[in-house]
Each structure stands twice: as C-alpha cells, then as structure tokens.
Regions:
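Catalytic alpha-helical scaffold of carbohydrate-active enzymes acting on polysaccharides/glycoconjugates
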Residues: 1-164, 184-205, 212-254
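Positively charged, amphipathic and often flexible ligand-engagement surfaces
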Residues: 165-180
Length: 254
C-alpha cells in the first residue's frame, strides 16, 4: 500500500511539474534594466465590441496616456475604429489553441493589414503557450509571460533567441478575489508598486474589455494615478531597450 501511495504521489508531482513548466525561462539570457520606474497599460481585445473598448480609450484620454492593445483575428474592432484610434499601440494576440504556426502567421497578416503596419510584439493565450522558437522569426518581443502564475519578475529580459520578453500582470486572476470594491486587490498591488519604484521596475498592467466594465477600470485607474512612473507603450519600451542594449536581432519574417 505504501508503494502505491508513492506511485500516486510521484505521478501527481510529475503532472504538476509539467503544468508548472515555465518554458520561456528556458531562453533567459539577461535582465534588461530600465532608467526609471515605468508602466505600460495593455489590453487583450478578446471581445472586439467597440463600446466596451471605447470605455478604455476614454479613461486613458482622461489621464493622457496611450496603451498597447493586442488584437485577435477572431474578434477585432472595425477598420474604421482602428483608424480613429491610430495613436494606440496595436500589436498581435496569437491563438495557438488548435492552430499551428502557419495559421497563426496568416492571422498576424490579417491584423497587420487591419492596422496598416506590421506588428512586432506578440502575446499568446495562457491556455496554450507556444515555444518561443515558433514565433521568433516573426516578432521582436513577446509578452505572454504571466507574473501571477509563474515567478514574478519586475523587469523584462532578453532571450538567447534575440527576442525581448515582457512579463505582465493580468487582472483576470482576481475575479474570485474581488471584494469590498477591490480594496484587498489594491493592498497586493501597493506592494508591487513600491517594489517597482525602488528598483526602476517595469509594470505591465493587463486588462480585458469585459471585466473592465465591471471592475477592471478601477484596477487600471488605481495604477494610472500612481506617482513616480513614466507611462509608455510597450513598443516604445521595446525600442528604448533595443537602442540601449544595442539589440540587433531582426526577425526573418518581418
């Protein structure tokens, strides 16, 4: 019986190890330092319903910030809406659920045509993260690494593939924690903000259109009203780091 218990425990450990594998860290080369505490507001537009996205844009206009929006081929806003909001940093959200790389590249081209230029940063669903080797020929940077379910990193890092990885903080993890108008969530975020201030960290805040309407707005407004941070788009941060560190990597498929 004890041996059966051992086999069961060993099997569970193997499954957990497989689930917890952070494949992006396999390509870690070095941490990229920033010159000042920096914040990026990013959104996964998994629901291209324009009134919901307008709420996000209106709030950012109120505070004078531009964000980075990752667009999916399966659900994106109209060409008219994209043109009217051309100051937004539009990038590509890949869907590897049931799709191989050739289909993902095809969808990337659809989004590139929609926004009128080539997207250079990719983010993939947490449900199905690709090996970075699959996307390195088409992007200069990735932002799929999730700071809540993996080792929390306050700074981007360069991979040995040449791509930059931008770890993000998703609001979706707090759906079941949201109590008392989010005061419990804010306590956690305050600790993160203090750490980022002290270390010239990079905070990439991720919100989605649907929860934004209910409580995601409060989370983003909490971040945007914090002092001591330079707010940039992810593309701006990427270009700054590539210049600072003289990163010459150019994807073959761009």
């Amino acid at each position: 019986m004890k041996y059966l218990h051992y086999l069961l425990a060993a099997s569970v450990r193997m499954l957990r190890k497989k689930y917890a594998k952070t494949k992006y860290l396999d390509y870690y080369e070095k941490t990229l330092e920033l010159n000042e505490p920096t914040m990026v507001f990013s959104h996964d537009i998994d629901e291209g319903y324009e009134p919901n996205i307008n709420d996000i844009v209106d709030m950012e206009k109120k505070y004078g910030v531009n964000s980075t929006m990752f667009l999916l081929a399966m659900s994106h806003p109209s060409k008219k809406w994209v043109n009217a909001n051309s100051k937004i940093d539009f990038q590509f959200h890949a869907n590897f659920i049931g799709n191989k790389i050739n289909k993902v590249v095809e969808e990337k081209r659809l989004i590139d045509d929609l926004i009128g230029k080539k997207t250079e940063i990719v983010r993939a669903h947490q449900y199905h993260l690709p090996d970075l080797k699959l996307v390195k020929d088409y992007f200069k940077a990735d932002s799929s690494y999730d700071n809540w379910t993996k080792l929390t990193l306050f700074k981007p890092f360069l991979t040995n593939l040449g791509m930059i990885e931008f770890p993000h903080l998703p609001e979706i993890e707090f759906i079941n924690l949201y109590k008392g108008k989010g005061e419990n969530i804010k306590k956690i975020y305050k600790e993160i903000i203090e750490m980022a201030r002290k270390t010239n960290g990079l905070l990439i805040v991720l919100t989605h259109p649907t929860p934004f309407k209910k409580w995601g707005k409060q989370i983003q407004e909490f971040f945007v009203t914090q002092d001591g941070f330079k707010v940039k788009t992810m593309h701006e941060v990427m270009n700054d780091l590539r210049n600072e560190y003289k990163i010459k990597y150019e994807p073959k498929g761009l």
